């Protein structure tokens, strides 16, 4: 089973791909999709849609995990992240891929054991948990992996108690 984790963003969208077999999670890929600030909003959304569509079609995930939108003091940022989330949800719906959402607190707790962990702590734990040679970079891609890991961990716990 392939799990696709998404850290939604308008300027930079991070993703992480894990393969799940039983209780084992293996790193497959991670990366980012970036848009240019100078481009108009419609063109940036088109770039996100087309590039993310290609990535999803390449990895063919069974499930998508995404960070929940949390209240932001910067309303413009919250709106643009919401637009990026809409693209993820649309692509998933078009492919009949279920989407699961997690708060930043849930993700940090699943990866590090603490819901108050720093980004650096999350990166370091993802490196250890997935036996990566280097810290996953950039932060957005590391967050995508952390979101995928969180979903895998929740799936395993849920499966055990079913």
UniProtKB/Swiss-Prot annotation:
Residues noted as binding Mg(2+) 1 in the record, renumbered to the chain: 7, 140
Enzyme Commission code: 3.1.21.10
GO terms assigned for molecular function: crossover junction DNA endonuclease activity; DNA binding; magnesium ion binding
Active site: 7, 67, 140
Binding site for Mg(2+) 2: 67
Enzyme class label: hydrolase
UniProt xrefs under InterPro entries: RNaseH-like_sf, RNaseH_sf, X-over_junc_endoDNase_RuvC
Principal location: cytoplasm
Cofactor note text: Binds 2 Mg(2+) ion per subunit.
Needed cofactors: Mg(2+)
Gene Ontology cellular-component terms listed: cytoplasm; Holliday junction resolvase complex
One Pfam family here: RuvC
Keywords: Cytoplasm, DNA damage, DNA recombination, DNA repair, DNA-binding, Endonuclease, Hydrolase, Magnesium, Metal-binding, Nuclease
Reactions that this protein is recorded to catalyse: Endonucleolytic cleavage at a junction such as a reciprocal single-stranded crossover between two homologous DNA duplexes (Holliday junction)
Biological process per Gene Ontology, one example term: DNA repair
UniProt KW ATP-binding keyword: no
Compartments, record wording: Cytoplasm
Subunit-structure text: Homodimer which binds Holliday junction (HJ) DNA. The HJ becomes 2-fold symmetrical on binding to RuvC with unstacked arms; it has a different conformation from HJ DNA in complex with RuvA. In the full resolvosome a probable DNA-RuvA(4)-RuvB(12)-RuvC(2) complex forms which resolves the HJ.
PANTHER family recorded: CROSSOVER JUNCTION ENDODEOXYRIBONUCLEASE RUVC
Function in brief: The RuvA-RuvB-RuvC complex processes Holliday junction (HJ) DNA during genetic recombination and DNA repair. Endonuclease that resolves HJ intermediates. Cleaves cruciform DNA by making single-stranded nicks across the HJ at symmetrical positions within the homologous arms, yielding a 5'-phosphate and a 3'-hydroxyl group; requires a central core of homology in the junction. The consensus cleavage sequence is 5'-(A/T)TT(C/G)-3'. Cleavage occurs on the 3'-side of the TT dinucleotide at the point of strand exchange.
Family, per entry: Belongs to the RuvC family.
Full protein name: Crossover junction endodeoxyribonuclease RuvC
Species of origin: Pseudothermotoga lettingae (strain ATCC BAA-301 / DSM 14385 / NBRC 107922 / TMO) (Thermotoga lettingae)
